[in-house]
Amino acid sequence: MTARGRAAACAKGRRKDGMLVNVKRNIPFSPPDISQAEIDEVADALRSGWITTGPKTKQFERDLAEFSHTTRFACFNSATAALECALRSLGIGPGDEVITSAYTYTASASPILHVGATPVLCDVAPGSFEIDYDQVAGLVTEKTRAVIPVDVAGVMCDYDRLRAALESVSGKWRPRTPREELFDRVPIVADGAHSLGAVCHGLHSGLAADFTSFSFHAVKNLTTAEGGALTWRDIPGLDSEELYRDLMLMSLHGQTKDALAKTRVGAWEYDVAFCGWKCNMTDLQAALGLAQLRRYPGLLARRRENVERYERGLADLPFALIKHYGDDFASSGHLMLARIEGASQEFRNAFINEMGEEGVACNVHYKPLPLLTAYKGLGFDIADFPNALAQFSNEVTLPLHTKLSDDDVDYVIAKCHEVFAKLSAKGVR
């Protein structure tokens, strides 16, 4: 039976595989996928007596670098901290400007404010969740120190286009610090919170941008409960070990030795090079990540199966689904974004509420930054970002995770058909 046929069977209440599929289910939006392997790894950390930053964190960094085909990873307690430390490592601060997308979560933009710089928001391209590459070039000034593109839903941005756009205005680039002088254009610091394991044009996420941050929050594909990391491509002239040491200093008060280094006999002496921050990852978090990373290829494969099942089952509804896979790219399959074509915000909101009544938790990704109080207070007006508003107005995110069975996905598909038909019959537009 085809996916569409299965969805129709669900809607009619027929039995499939001996189970009544029209019985109301509870489909959570994005629960963590925790197996015995994660429990054992965390228990091992607890038994070891070493629970803060230590050997498991360092191993996790090495394993992430191997997985992503990069030279180095630096782990933090969040992707937000990773982004902030990346900006600080470039010397970005007051008086500087950093461009990012208007269509993202606040964590892409708040680090710009944290370092004292000014966020410059860019609209997305028409009908796209990606930053408008042509508009980026027009926003670059002599104050621009970095661009933060966002890999929404795990789909990597077109970094070739972004680089070309920045190279077209390289005459405005004014490097000030030794690290900035390694670039002949504005550096790209990617928000890859969603895109660990994604590939585009033959490059893994982490290799396409100059710097890439990742999130391991509880709802991400790979979780450490809370956590994040930063990696970077091999940049001619960049001393990766020096950069790593600087990032570690930033993450631990500027202290020259972490707790693990101080355990060596006679190694108690330390210095504080500058007043840094406190955003290090712990071994308990890393232990969870180590087990998750070993399972990650299988988790990515399962996500792809679910995405493709959605694509088949929703093909006859006016849902514009984000494209996760193509001839030269594969996303991490993080979020199932769907735009209900021709629908209003009223219809979208009613759709989410009705799906909730059927036991299916849905969400919206994202409310554009200019609609949020904090960014309104900075002077941003949603009228200046019409494409972001259009993407948001009829977007709904369906459950997508590795705890979903085939029957669960078929149930969601069936309920999408039922709820869409119900609202349309009521005249909701």
Where are the model-predicted features located?
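Active-site PLP attachment segment
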Residues: 194, 207-257, 283
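N-terminal "arm"/small-domain region of PLP-dependent enzymes with the aminotransferase-like
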Residues: 4, 13-51, 55, 273, ...
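PLP-dependent aminotransferase-like
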Residues: 88, 92-192, 199
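PLP-dependent aminotransferase class I/II
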Residues: 58-62, 70-71, 146-150, 155, ...
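Phosphate-binding glycine-rich loop
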Residues: 50-97, 111-113, 121-122, 170-174
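Hydrophobic/aromatic ligand-binding patch that stacks against planar heteroaromatic rings
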Residues: 110-112, 204, 284
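Conserved active-site segment immediately N-terminal to the catalytic lysine
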Residues: 176-223, 268-272, 321
